[in-house]
Amino acid sequence: GKGIFVTGTGTDIGKTYVTALILKKLREASVNAGYYKAALSGAYRNADKLVPGDAAYVTSISGLPVSPEQLVSYIYEPAVSPHLAAQLEKRPVDMKKIQSDFHHIATQFDVVVAEGSGGIICPLRMDSSPIMLTDVIQTLHLPILIVAHAGLGTINSTVLTAAYAKQHNITVNGIILNQYDSNNLMHRDNKKQIEHLTGIPVVACVKSNETELSVSAELLLHLCNDIS
């Protein structure tokens, strides 16, 4: 199968929203595409079960007929960064579980779209055996897509994210600008500068409240790499 890892330039940048649109586009093109997230904090309670909000959103938008709990390895209730939530709940993240869960999902789908937590610098476990989000991306051998905001400040955060990925030997296959307005001169210029400064193509621009990606499922598949 194939896979891609979606990260963002920060929290609340629209990473989950864009991930859902990617999956929706693939599934509407009859691609058997699935979702995976290693760790999610800030889950909400529904009756007596914890619901991983991001995964629930993605499955509902993309029409993925799987219960969201099955797509996330670690679900934490506290709305703090994952390593702190794990400490509070005394349930540290284990890389072997992440690997086996991911590969289990990869056997059920032809394409897996994995999603990070927060930005690219995200501690998942900070103790005597620390795990960073970049360790997960490297261990799963996935290339990344960076979701960035189209507006003011995006050049700095996007170029930094791409440079950090490169420094950690992570391949960036593309950048997606969210809340993009083609009539906005700065948005158009940001796109140009980001491509120039990173050498990475902006593969899609997503307008505010877009329900459909403007790029083809073929292009999205082309951005995925074979899962090893």
Predicted regions and their residues:
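Histidine-anchored nucleotide/phosphate-binding helix
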Residues: L23-R27, L133-I137, N156-Q167
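C-terminal lobe/tail of nucleotide-utilizing enzymes
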Residues: A163-S228
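Inter-motif core of Ras-like GTPase G domains
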Residues: M126-A150
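Charged helix-capping and loop-helix junction motifs
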Residues: M126-T134, V159-A162, H187-K192
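Conserved glycine(s) of the Walker
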Residues: I13-G14
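N-terminal phosphate/diphosphate-binding loop that engages ATP/GTP or pyrophosphate donors
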Residues: G3, Y17-P92, K96, D101-H104
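Switch II (G3) loop of P-loop NTPases
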Residues: I98, F102-S129
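Hydrophobic anchor at the beta1->P-loop junction of P-loop NTPases
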Residues: V6
